[in-house]
Amino acid sequence: MGEARILILTASIGSGHTRAAEAIRTALKARPGAAEQQIDVVDFMSREVSIIHYLMKRIYLTMLRFVPNLYDVFFRIAGKKTSGGAVRAAFAWVMMRTMGRIIRTYQPDLVVATHPFPEGAAALWRIRHGEHFPLAALLTDYALHAIWFVHDVDAYFVATEEMADEMAMLGFDRRRIHATGIPIVLSASRLARREARVQAGISEELPTLLLMGGGLGLGDMDATLAALEQVEQRLAILVVAGRNASLEERARARGKHSHHAVYVSGYTHDVPVLMHAADLLITKPGALTISEAFAAGLPLLLHDPIPGPETENAVYATRCGAAVWLHPGERMAPAVEDILAHHLPVMRRAARNCAREEAAQRVAEILTEMLQRK
C-alpha cells in the first residue's frame, strides 16, 4: 500500500482536544507497521493555519473568561436539532477553504478530527470536491452535542456506551460508533504513589491535593488557594497554572506565606506523575483531565464548570462516584476535609472502575483497520 498518510486535525481551544490528538498519534506510532505511516497533527485554530480561525479562537477564549453565560447561550443554540445544523454548516462553510489548503498540502489517506470545527469542514470539503479519504471524529466530552452530528463521518469515537446508544437512537449507524473511551497518554500508568511523590519533589508525607485549571489556566485558582488556607490540617498542594504566567507568579507568592507546603508549576507534561502523587484533584471538569484522573484512580473535587460541556462532564464524574461537585455557595474547605477523612477509598475505586486506559490503543486499532479497508 506504500506509506499511509494520517492527518489528525485538532484545535487549541483549551488543551483537551490537542491532548487527545497527541494520545492518538502516540498510540498509532506504537503499533506494528508504524514505520509505514506518516502521522501529522495540525492545529486547525492556530495563527499559522489561518488568521481568521485564530481570531475566532481569541474571541471564544475572551468570551469564556469574561462572559461565560454568553457561551452558554451559544452552546444551547448549537445543541438544538433545529439550529445546531445551521451553526455547524456556517462554521464549515467559513472554514472550508482553509481545509482545502490543508488537504492539498498533506494529501491524507485518513483524516481524524478531535474538534467539531475541522470535522465539519473536512466533511463539507469531501462532499464538495469528491474526495474519498475516510473521516473519523473523536468526541472529547462525556455528553453528546449536536455540533458534532455530521452523518457523512465514517467513524465516531465516543466516551461511553450510553453515548453510542444515544447516537444510534438519533439515526446514526451504530456500526460506525465506537465506545472506546477518551484517549489519554499512559506515561505513568503503573507508577507507585511513593515513586510519584519522589518525582514530584514532595518531601513531606502529607495529604496531597493537586490543583488544575486546564491547559489555559482558567478557573479561580486564587480563590481556591485562599479557601484551602481554612483547612487546619497541613497539606501538600501541587498547583499547575497552565500557560497562565500571571497565575503562576501569584501562586508562588501565596505559597510563601501558606501554612501548607505549596509546589507550583506552569504548563507541564508531568501531570500523570502529579496525579499519581496526589490524593485529591481539585479542578474544572474538562473531560481529558477527568479521564486522566480516572486512569490514575484519583478522586476529584470539581468546581466552576464552563457552562455546557464541562457541566455535563461534572454530572458524569459525580454520577460515577469518583467526584464531588462543589456548587456555587458551597465552601471548599469543609468539602476537602470531608473527602480526605471519609471518602477517599470509595472514590478511588470508583475512579478506577470508570477508567478506559486502553482508549487510545483501541482508537488506533480501528483507524488502522479503516486504512486497510481503503
Model segments located where?
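Nucleotide-activated sugar donor-binding and catalytic core shared by glycosyltransferases
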Residues: M1-G242, S246-K374
